Regions:
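A residue-level marker of the well-folded mature domains of exported/periplasmic proteins
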Residues: 1-134
């Protein structure tokens, strides 16, 4: 089931709880929730608890990594996230601008979305998420 996310929920993920509960109430056989940005991903535990789901009822997945998402992974409500490594997304363009301006170097290509984070590897990146590096 695809659920369009209204602008108010995209802006303030805390407003998504009634929508999540209604979607799952109307479709109780859904077994996976995939969100499309960090605010919604961080809210998955809240949404799932409000819908009466335990950690084994619905697989939670999403994008980005933050301290609340680390908590969600550790609690079992979020199973996997794609860490887009936002520090690199912000840092590398500045490096590229400098290299192009100073030395005329061509553009760099860097894949910043290749890291899957789960309970198996969360301990390695959790301190970096707390510092907003990962």
């Amino acid at each position: 089931v695809y659920q369009e996310i209204p602008d108010n929920v995209n802006s303030d993920a805390s407003q998504g709880t009634p929508m999540y509960v209604a979607t799952y109430s109307a479709n109780p056989d859904i077994k996976m929730a995939i969100t499309d940005h960090g605010g919604l991903t961080a809210s998955l535990p809240t949404y799932m608890k409000a819908a009466g789901h335990g950690t084994e009822d619905v697989c939670g997945a999403g994008f980005d990594l933050s301290a609340p998402i680390v908590d969600g992974i550790n609690s079992g409500y979020i199973d996997v996230v794609i860490d887009q490594q936002p520090f690199i997304q912000g840092y590398m363009p500045i490096v590229q601008l400098y290299l192009t301006t100073k030395f005329g170097m061509a553009g760099l290509a860097m894949d910043t979305g290749a890291a899957f984070v789960t309970k198996a590897n969360i301990d390695a990146v959790a301190p970096l998420a707390a510092l907003q590096i990962r």
